[in-house]
Amino acid sequence: MNIELLQQLCEASAVSGDEQEVRDILINTLEPCVNEITFDGLGSFVARKGNKGPKVAVVGHMDEVGFMVTHIDESGFLRFTTIGGWWNQSMLNHRVTIRTHKGVKIPGVIGSVAPHALTEKQKQQPLSFDEMFIDIGANSREEVEKRGVEIGDFISPEANFACWGEDKVVGKALDNRIGCAMMAELLQTVNNPEITLYGVGSVEE
């Protein structure tokens, strides 16, 4: 497998509904080796190689779980909602990246009320995501807005891609960036004039 391509795909931000970065990487990879690339109205693409024989499609979804900004408070903290399936306790203290409407990436971290400010009962209960916030180092709502962050901006989790041992990789969104990388590699390497091979990058799994 092309580990360099897989790393590029995993490190891209592509929360469901905002798959542009992954799509651009795949299109740039596939354009030299396919006959045609078409798009649908939602942002999925279909790359075709060949034009006769049985049709074979390999599909990988480009999106990942993430968050969306729902509110900016007067102290400069971002409130958010989840996109996709999340276990609340895995979110706290996670580093994230906010992608603004202009494509600027702003780092942040998911926080909550400090433990010493919680009651004993609260300390025994898991936090829900609506008790958390994202801190981007701003001191006010005005400072957040000056940086270009708006309600509706997408937020992706941050995780470093790494190779462990001889045959393991770790990173975010491996489901299904591995599928996308395999799809691209098949289109690059399979040369069978007896089939029509399609590679599909789908959105909003």
What are the residue ranges of the model-derived segments?
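N-terminal hydrophobic/helix-forming segments and targeting peptides
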Residues: 1-205
